[in-house]
Amino acid sequence: MYLEEKLHKIKKPIMVLGTSSGAGKSLTVTAICRILKNLAEQPIPFKGQNMSNNAWVDWEGGEMAYSQALQAFACGVNPSSEMNPILLKPQGNSVSEVIHLGKSIGTTSAKNYYQDWFIPGWEVIKKSLNSIYKKNPNCRLIIEGAGSPVEMNLKHRDLTNLKIAKYLKANCILVTDIERGGVFAQIIGTLELMKPEEKKLIKGIIINRFRGDLSLFEEGKKWIEEKTQIPVIGIVPWLNDSFPPEDSLDLLENKSRFTNAEIKVGIIKLPSISNFSDFDPLENEESILIEWIRESQNLKKYDFIILPGSKQTIKDQMFLEKTGLSHDLREYSNNKGHIIGICGGLQMLGTFLEDPFLKEGSKTFSEQKIKGIGLLPLRTTFFEEKLTRQISSESLWPCQSKINGFEIHNGQTELDNTQNSLKINPIFKDLNLGWYKENKEGGTIAGTYIHGIFENDIWRDQYINLIRMNKKLPALKKRTSSYKNKREKIIENLANEFNKHLNLSSLLN
């Protein structure tokens, strides 16, 4: 294998391990990727195995975790599923879809995963590493671990942490979150549970999310270094809500920073919600305030409502019916409301959902065909084969503009010809990518299969202007910066903040 022959010649990879989940590994990797890019290195992100329903589709149609796609943007390279060779997408009841190198290859229970998938998983990780280095022999891999590297009941079967570190002889950083408390016990406990040869790989410690005067931790820093004989290479202060966690869902949970927002958006909090990165562009709009809708309520206070993607569309539609939210959405539509569904949300807005292969949460024969919300005359059937691809098209509504995004879905949607009273129109020149309906009473119902639709600045502005016109507000001013430019600025600011408090020099040998 190419890599094993060249291992002694490659630039030392940097691996970011954490004392726990949520310690800040993802953002640390993102920051390091951009710092090294700015130093004219060729960084490439890597995470052997990730568990997330927040996915991205690369240019070859391969699925990967969104966090690795974001890290690729920080590196200035195109995302590739090789950067995240194993993606586990939870489906509920301890069952996950298994994706190897971007392609779905089955489902597994948590109990059976390591028994059935450990060996093939390690092979696909090695295959990806080999391919990355063969294509980019001068790159420096920036690797993200997962959770804690010393879960002793799982350590011998852990594909994502120390097994990769030892295989690549990586320079490892241990990141810990001081905001949670117990930082000394976290660091010492993690290191004590490592074997001597594993501990030798740890070249630096980062204290993350420190609040207050950094000089107040000097004594703590000295104690850690004396106790562990490992340098503390960074004490990173608490960074405000400008920088989202890995999947950005936690940021949305507490979103209220634009207190003077003119448009209030409600997002239905589905139990199996997926691809919530679809909302990131809206979070950055100063005119918009986002709130989660978790239970049945009067929806009149919202200027428009988003029904998001779902990993289990049948199951989530049953949730909407059970909670009364389906009824609430119909009432909202009848009262001149604006609703947009994305992927699974589009499917639920239709008249019927059929799941003959039990792909979307059906458990019994009676659940294989259920009614949708009934706001669009569309029928969806879920098949075994999944469609994953990048999209370039042109919108017809609410404006004519070029559109980019991606699709991830098992369902195939077609017009329900039994519902002649519900007239709908295509949103895009590619007719099967989305539909919309204008209500006689006012308001619109729209649905699209395109993830990332709101990243398209012209389309997003015109959709928001449609809502603003409904409220008799002036149209948005012509924008001076695109969403992608804003994302770049956020990544650059993140790297600058980390760079002020981080010393990577000892790891770049």
Swiss-Prot record:
Pathway: Cofactor biosynthesis; adenosylcobalamin biosynthesis. Residues 262-459 form the GATase cobBQ-type domain. SUPFAM superfamilies: Class I glutamine amidotransferase-like (SSF52317), P-loop containing nucleoside triphosphate hydrolases (SSF52540). The active site is at 343 (nucleophile), 451. PROSITE patterns: GATASE_COBBQ. GO terms for molecular function: ABC-type vitamin B12 transporter activity; catalytic activity. Signal peptide: none annotated. One of its GO terms (biological process) is cobalamin biosynthetic process. Pfam families: CbiA, GATase_3. Keywords: Cobalamin biosynthesis, Glutamine amidotransferase. It comes from the Bacteria. Catalyzes amidations at positions B, D, E, and G on adenosylcobyrinic A,C-diamide. NH(2) groups are provided by glutamine, and one molecule of ATP is hydrogenolyzed for each amidation. Belongs to the CobB/CobQ family. CobQ subfamily. HAMAP family: CobQ (MF_00028). This is Cobyric acid synthase. It comes from Prochlorococcus marinus (strain MIT 9312). The gene is cobQ.
